[in-house]
């Protein structure tokens, strides 16, 4: 049976792997997909925080970053909340064909580069908070 720290480590490692995928997708000019994986990376580090803050080692099956962090000791600024809400779109809306065309239009190189930089900053901040 895994310890709480082993569960947290699993989610952290998955977050790092997904971040590498986001970077590769960006380099391959798959901007929408890179933002999907950036969200996935943040989701997994948020789940690590959720495990740390809760009795259970199994986080809720949700993709909502703010919901996951609302059940932890992490305090977000309004700016962070706005960014995480925006990033949530790429996980939820990015799954459905009727929404994908809208997201493709806004997912330019410049847009994705800016959002990935913000996401990386959030990922590093959240990873540091786990230590």
Predicted regions and their residues:
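Terminal alpha-helical segments
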Residues: 1-131
């Amino acid at each position: 049976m895994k310890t709480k720290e082993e569960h947290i480590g699993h989610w952290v490692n998955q977050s790092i792997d997904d971040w590498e995928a986001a970077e590769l997708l960006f380099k391959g000019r798959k901007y929408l997909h890179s933002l999907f994986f950036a969200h996935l990376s943040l989701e997994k580090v948020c789940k690590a925080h959720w495990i740390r803050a809760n009795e259970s080692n199994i986080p809720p099956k949700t993709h909502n970053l703010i919901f996951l962090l609302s059940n932890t000791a992490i305090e977000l600024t309004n700016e962070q909340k706005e960014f995480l809400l925006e990033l949530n779109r790429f996980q939820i809306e990015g799954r459905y064909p009727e929404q994908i065309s809208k997201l493709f239009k806004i997912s330019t190189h410049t847009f994705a580069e800016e959002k990935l930089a913000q996401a990386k900053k959030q990922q590093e901040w959240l990873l540091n908070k786990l230590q």
